[in-house]
């Protein structure tokens, strides 16, 4: 994501459409079915929502907006539907290695692992496990953000 000086209004709006408007439209389309089945919604945010990563102003802002929208949805869809958020930190995926190259990905992993209290970054399965738990096992949990970031959100100065 470009920094503030290189971020056009069009790019800012595109990122918001993807990360906020898209999930809103999905919830609106599925709300009746979710209510009748006592369903659950898990939106995927990012630790960037609370850390405000400097090189991704629109991304961080859109993920914070997604979390706030999820809190509002948790109130308005209760008691029939639970709404929660999973907020991953840096997560090892094939995309990260392809985008940064093997050496770049290893450097990012080393940097994040040295800061996070658990001294490791997440795997995709860690994020998936949190989502499955919120859908299937967390029957009395709504309006929450579950950080899957090794503690990065408590270790990084804001």
List each language-model region with its residue ranges:
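Active-site loop immediately N-terminal to the catalytic Tyr-X3-Lys motif
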Residues: 4-5, 51-57, 119
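Alpha-helical segment proximal to the catalytic Tyr-Lys
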Residues: 32, 74-79
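Residue(s) in the substrate-gating loop at a strand-loop-helix junction
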Residues: 46
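Short, small/polar-rich loop/turn modules that mediate ligand/substrate recognition or access, typified
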Residues: 78-82, 141-143
């Amino acid at each position: 994501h470009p920094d503030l000086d290189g971020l056009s209004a069009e790019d800012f709006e595109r990122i918001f459409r993807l990360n906020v408007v898209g999930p809103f439209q999905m919830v609106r389309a599925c709300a009746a079915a979710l209510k009748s089945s006592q369903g659950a919604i898990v939106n995927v945010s990012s630790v960037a929502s609370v850390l405000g990563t400097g090189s991704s102003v629109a991304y961080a802002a859109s993920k914070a907006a997604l979390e706030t929208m999820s809190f509002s949805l948790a109130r308005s869809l209760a008691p029939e539907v639970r709404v929660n958020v999973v907020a991953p930190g840096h997560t090892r995926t094939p995309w990260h290695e392809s985008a940064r190259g093997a050496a770049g990905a290893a450097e990012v992993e080393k940097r994040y692992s040295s800061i996070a209290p658990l001294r490791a970054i997440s795997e995709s399965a860690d994020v998936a496990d949190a989502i499955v738990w919120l859908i299937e096992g967390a029957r009395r949990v709504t309006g929450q953000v579950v950080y899957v970031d090794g503690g990065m959100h408590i270790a990084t100065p804001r």
